[in-house]
A protein has these predicted regions:
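N-terminal secretory signal peptides that target proteins for export/translocation
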Residues: 1-7
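Cleavable N-terminal signal peptides of Sec/SRP-targeted secreted and luminal proteins
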Residues: 9-28
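Short functional hotspots where side chains directly engage DNA or cofactors
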Residues: 66-68
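Catalytic-core signature of thiol
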Residues: 26-58, 62-64, 73-117, 121-477
Length: 477
């Protein structure tokens, strides 16, 4: 932290020195000319009245005019130089970079900038030790905030709470308070990791950590699930990309801009995240092959897929009780495809009967592959194969509101949620890097009312929350 702060301070000092020198010459940061002595003002043209009473006086005044013109040219050159210096410093602080990549990549960058324009481009030193949430100071304040949570922020909860006993109401209010305090801690933790994420009140604030995990997560949390079955991994391991392939990777990439991502879905209170992570990857692979975006059936996987991972005890897909995307893709390969969402709609619970034969086939895959932990290789796989199905530790997501999350204390091995990587980019100033912070764009399955319209951004190249521990790509060759 000290080294990051000193690096930040050094850049600021350089900037101040540059500005001071040029302001003394009569030039402001944005290139506007101020008074230099009393020769000229901002926006004024040099006006010289040449007296012609004598030849000597005329020569003297012409000489003064030439000097003033030279001074004006020097100041303009200084202004240009200062602008270049400012651009250099702004780049160091995370300002606008030079344009790179294709027109489409630049368009994606501009969309990302507009989408997250409310996020600060700089991380202030004070934000490293504070949270945007304030501690609740009294019982009365807690009651008011909880009432607002139930009645105003999430009015769909109002009827539910009208049926609760006073004892249950008090219990939920205490859980709300614990989540409030935890959100403050997590935002501070994100700052320590170099992130810009905001944590606040979400629809999950009246769920304990255990309830949240049971009802909204669903990736099988076995000790070996992060590396999948050893036999399966060897059989399906992706070949490492060449250096030439990696050099060609674009700076920004987003499958949403290319039309390969369906709208954000909502799994409800069912641990079916693994099915949404799976269908998202196959929807993308199918789009790359056919040019058509077809929403696929999560319900078919809930009802029909009971496959198990070899060599992993209790790693069998089990409806709302959890599953693994690799198991699901194995089922889809063996079954011959996956039905459309329309023909086999989602119900948020497992039915007793598999109705796969009754539905309309929406997409097929030829195989799947495990991507290694190298996040540059992950970016290559994303660009080549489409959106990636991954596992993640979702503890910090319960209170996530927006921004780039870089959880410092998030356990990388405790994967409990299946999500979908759809792109990557970079934004803002990172104290530890002195340049923009790279991030993954993740599609979640908790509806558009959560996070950034249903999406989550997390630091790239750091392995935060195990984002690189279980990565699967669908193949459609």
């Amino acid at each position: 932290m000290k080294s990051a702060s000193s690096s930040f301070s050094s850049v600021i000092i350089v900037y101040v020195i540059v500005v001071t020198v040029f302001v003394s010459l009569g030039v402001f940061v944005d290139g506007r000319e101020f008074e230099h002595g009393r020769a000229f003002g901002r926006g004024s043209s040099l006006k010289t009245t040449i007296q012609t009473t004598t030849s000597e006086e005329g020569q003297q005044q012409r000489h003064e005019q030439q000097q003033q013109q030279q001074q004006q040219q020097q100041l303009r050159a200084s202004s240009l130089l200062l602008t270049r210096a400012k651009e250099f410093v702004l780049k160091s602080l995370g300002g606008k970079l030079n344009k790179k990549g294709t027109d489409l990549e630049e368009e994606e960058k501009e969309k990302e900038t507009r989408r997250h324009s409310s996020s600060s481009s700089f991380t202030s030193l004070s934000s490293l030790v504070s949270s945007s949430l304030k501690a609740i100071e009294s019982r009365a304040e807690l009651r008011e905030k909880f009432r607002h949570f139930v009645s105003v922020q999430f009015p769909e909860k109002k009827k539910e709470y009208e049926r609760k006993t006073e004892e249950e109401y008090e219990k939920r209010m205490e859980i709300f308070h614990e989540n409030w305090k935890r959100a403050i801690e997590r935002e501070i933790d994100d700052r320590k990791g170099g992130g810009s994420a905001k944590h606040g009140v979400t629809k999950f604030f009246d769920f304990s950590e255990e309830e949240f995990r049971e009802q909204y997560l669903g990736l099988l949390s076995t000790s070996t699930s992060s590396s999948a079955s050893k036999d399966a991994f060897r059989k399906h391991q992706m070949e490492a990309p060449s250096d030439e392939d990696l050099e060609k990777l674009p700076q920004y990439y987003d499958w949403r801009a290319r039309g390969a991502v369906t709208p954000v879905k909502d799994q409800g209170q069912c641990g079916s995240c693994w099915t949404f992570s799976t269908t998202g990857a196959i929807e993308g692979a199918n789009f790359i092959k056919t040019g058509k975006l077809v929403s696929l059936s999560e319900q078919q996987l809930l009802d029909c897929d009971v496959g198990c991972a070899p060599d992993i005890p209790n790693a069998c897909d089990s409806g709302c009780n959890g599953g693994l995307p690799s198991n699901a893709m194995e089922y889809i390969v063996e079954h011959g495809g996956l039905d459309t969402e329309k023909s086999y709609p989602y119900k948020a619970y497992k039915e007793d009967t598999c109705r796969a034969k009754e539905g309309k086939l929406g997409a097929t895959i030829s195989n799947y592959t495990f991507v290694g932990k190298n996040e540059t290789h992950m970016a290559h796989a994303l660009v080549k194969y489409g959106p990636l199905s991954i596992g993640i530790n979702a503890a910090w997501m319960q209170s996530y509101v927006g921004g780039v999350a870089c959880p410092w204390l998030c356990n990388k091995d405790a994967l409990d949620h299946g999500v979908l990587i759809v792109g990557y980019g970079e934004e803002g100033f990172a104290p530890a890097r002195l340049h923009k912070e790279p991030y993954w764009v993740i599609k979640n399955s908790w509806g558009m009312g959560w996070g950034e319209e249903g999406y989550y951004r997390i630091c790239k190249d750091k392995g935060n929350c195990g984002v690189n521990n279980m990565v699967v790509a669908a193949l459609n060759e």
